[in-house]
Design a protein with these regions (language model features):
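Cleft-lining beta-strand/loop regions that shape enzyme active-site pockets
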Residues: 58-60, 69-74, 83-86, 93-215
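Extended, small/polar residue-biased N-terminal targeting/export presequences
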Residues: 1-58, 106-108, 112-122, 133
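Structural motif
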Residues: 76-78
Length: 215
């Protein structure tokens, strides 16, 4: 297939750079990535992470009330196979396209879990997943805690809802936790920064031609 050959050629070129941050996406992989950053997609409802050296794929976080949680997936689980695909032999962005799919369809996953001698075999029914990218709670001494798991389209709105809720509870200071946040939309980041920083230039992007965009 000519399209497959072309995709393989470009993937090989990017892998040859030896730069883990330079990746070629097929049309399907790009659409999957954009769906995840939109905040809504059809899949299982889990955040995945891949070790750049071993290629091992792990469950970083399972969202509440999702197919992944209902099937029994847990944070820290290791994905061994998706259907008949060895997870560690595929780039994460491509593997995700096999995990997501139409509502009501199922995906079979083989899971390794610490403390379990045998692999777990799970059939998970895909459903609509609305990603909660912000969680919050009030700590002692009127300290608010806000964790942002990724920067998607609804993140700024969710962030301000958390801020206002904590203010209503008497928040006097705040901790913003970005640990394990893989990134996302730059505009989502700058919208949040506009909410909490004084007016002025926060960040800018500039391409090789000198075209600059201020935020």
């Amino acid at each position: 297939d000519k399209a497959d050959l072309t995709d393989g050629l470009y993937k090989g070129l990017f892998e040859g750079l030896g730069d883990s941050y330079s990746v070629y996406y097929t049309k399907e992989e790009y659409e999957s990535m954009m769906a995840s950053t939109s905040g809504t997609y059809f899949g299982i409802g889990a955040v995945l992470s891949q070790d750049v050296k071993t290629m091992q794929v792990s469950i970083l976080h399972v969202y509440e009330n999702t197919p992944a949680e209902k099937a029994g997936l847990k944070d820290g689980d290791v994905i061994v196979k998706v259907e008949d695909i060895n997870a560690a032999e595929m780039e994460l962005s491509e593997l995700v396209t096999h995990i997501r799919g139409d509502k009501g369809t199922t995906v079979h996953m083989q899971i390794a879990r610490e403390g379990e001698a045998d692999y777990l075999e799970l059939d998970i029914e895909r459903d609509k997943v609305e990603v909660p990218t912000v969680t919050s709670e009030m700590l002692d001494n009127h300290i608010g805690y806000i964790a942002i798991t990724e920067f998607a389209e609804p993140t700024e709105e969710q962030f301000m809802q958390a801020v206002n809720s904590l203010k209503d509870q008497g928040m006097e200071s705040v901790i913003i936790d970005l640990r394990d946040n893989p990134g996302g939309y730059l505009t989502a980041v700058t919208e949040i920064l506009d909410d909490i920083l004084p007016e002025g230039l926060t960040v800018y992007t500039e391409d090789k031609y000198g075209n600059r965009q201020n935020y």
